[in-house]
Amino acid sequence: MKTLVASILSLAVAAVLGSAAFAQEATPANGAAPAHHEEGATPHYPLKEPKEEEWSFAGPFGHYDKAQLQRGLKVYTEVCSACHSMNLVPFRMLDELGYNQAQVKAFAANYEVQDGPNAAGEMFTRKAVPSDHFPAPFANAEAAAASNNGAAPPDFSLIAKAREVERGFPQFVFDVFTQYQENGPDYIHALLTGYEEPPAGFQVPQGGHYNPYFHAAAVLAMPKPLSDGQVTYDDGAPQTVDQYSKDVSSFLMWAAEPHLEERKRTGFMVMIFLAIFTVLIYLTKRSVYANKDH
């Protein structure tokens, strides 16, 4: 029996090492997939895998950096909100970013929302209040598509959880132990910073933009949205595309999972409870069966 178990474990270890070696051989040193594919072969998107970035909210003890979230809100407000909605995020939640009620109320008042009907049965517009949600920039999906090369920009409420690149074997096995859950922010950052010139011989359709990090194709309708110095920061943070991308990715992660910190604290306490409970069960078992004949 011991020999059989040892053989199974040896085969498992060999399979893991073999898969890792195969993955290393199949992927270039920079982590990018080949830009060209054999004729007739179906390309695998994204053409380049997103790089794992450093995030304050990563790991079992991760937490949101409020200063970064405030910068990300500024990037979203001044750049992204022109095309992308956040229909599921109410203004009142901005107090979790470190703003007081007066600041949240003033921020919401910068927007107008549709309300009604009034006593005359007509719809009307009014200034937003903290209980309102971020308004959409377009009246409907058709209007959004007509203004963006035929592709309606997705809502950003849950984009950090909805957009991610699948990690193959054996990476997804290791992710269980490293608690890697930042696929979405890594993808968003890679996409925003990944615009580049297409390789020789690659034809970009009219109205398209080459980005090897796009999850569905090599070309997308959205032009490069960020440039250095585009958004002014008041806290002295670098005003670069890389920093903008990290900040807005963090903000979108918060929008998608605002209770992340509470979830991680609860999970840690549950693990402590289970550890103590396991010890108590073991000691109880030893006490009960201490004088029993086996």
Locate the predicted segments by residue.
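Acidic, low-complexity proline/glycine-rich segments
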Residues: 24-53
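Sec/Tat signal peptide C-region and signal peptidase I cleavage site
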Residues: 17-23
